[in-house]
Amino acid sequence: KIFEQAKIEFEKHIIKWGYQKSINDYIDCLFMSDIIPVTSNHDFFGISVMEAVFCNVWPILPDRLSYRELFKNKGHIENLYTNDNQLITKIEAAIKNIHQIRNQALKKVAQKYDWNRLARVYDSEIEKITK
């Protein structure tokens, strides 16, 4: 219900909404984005967040799930929040400082999960166990 309300209220500001029909549309959508505020209580490893970060989208994440390991332990506590007030404050700060956050490349956080790198690692590990 809240998403339906947001879609109506922010209709003039929304460029893309919902499921993207192709991977290229999805990637284009990520590259057009600046901020990804996440409120989920469940996330499988944070893959969608890593995809967004790889496309230079600024994440605002709950200090739980895999995000703590992916960001806080890497020194990026500014991307994590612990309550709704912090979430709102961090979103407001990101919007007010949008030019600065666009220059804050966190891509290096996501690069170690790039498939071009991981495929070789997986191939090597699979080869070890099949010998």
How should these model regions be labeled?
Residues 96-130:
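A charged, aromatic-enriched C-terminal amphipathic alpha-helix characteristic of glycosyltransferases
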Residues 58-61:
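Short hydrophobic beta-strand element within catalytic cores of glycosyltransferases
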Residues 2-21:
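Nucleotide-activated donor-binding/catalytic signature segment of Leloir-type glycosyltransferases, i.e.
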Residues 27, 45, 50-54, 68-69:
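Short alpha-helical segment that forms part of, or immediately flanks, the ligand-binding pocket
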Residues 20-23, 84:
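Structural motif corresponding to alpha-helix initiation and N-cap regions
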Residues 41:
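Aromatic "clamp/platform" in nucleotide-sugar-dependent glycosyltransferases that forms part
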Residues 27-33:
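Short alpha-helical donor nucleotide-sugar binding micro-motif in glycosyltransferases
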